[in-house]
Amino acid sequence: GWKGHIDSPSWNALEIPGPAGPIHARMFSDHSRDDRPLIVYFHGGGWVIGDLDTHTPFCHLLHQRSGCNVISVDYRLAPEHPFPAAPDDCLAAAHWIAEHIGDFGGSDHRIILAGDSAGANLASVACLEADPALREKIAGEIIIYPVTDHYNAGFPSYVERAKGQTLTANFMFMFWDTYLGERRPGDPGAARAFPLRSQQLATLPPT
């Protein structure tokens, strides 16, 4: 395994105006270099768990290894705040950061949206829902093992890898059901939770 050393993470706290109050975020940057690309990162956790603390070591390492500044964005979690609270927060954060890009670096005044698992889902949703002004400022997306569709799509992996993994099929059922709350996949408005079903995939930035 890897035997390297990670320096203690250092970051600056941010508060971003959100649809239901402040959205908390952390910026990992090298203040001696303001011309680095800027990654906006959404943490994973099935839209139910995870926060800024759980992903601080990763975001710090991402900053160190990529040569990019990184803003890690928190968002409201289910069950207290079911869909669409999370994508609403993430889209609002992306808009605000893009509008204030001059305060955070950004080598070409553009951002890269990124995330893992549920966070990758939210990054893709934000890219798909970006208005023209925001879309011009998104240079790309980085999606790490993204959750792109509901379990009712019947993908073979839900059977082939149902057990024996840390993330079992039952966990995925729980995460999706908790996230959607009283909504069902076919309900009006629920489609935005499933980026793989979008008819606008060709509009996504380089991925």
Predicted features and spans:
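Short loop/turn motifs at secondary-structure junctions and domain boundaries
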Residues: 5-8
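N-terminal targeting or regulatory segments adjacent to alpha/beta-hydrolase or S9 domains
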Residues: 1-3
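Alpha/beta-hydrolase superfamily serine-hydrolase fold, recognizing
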Residues: 10-207
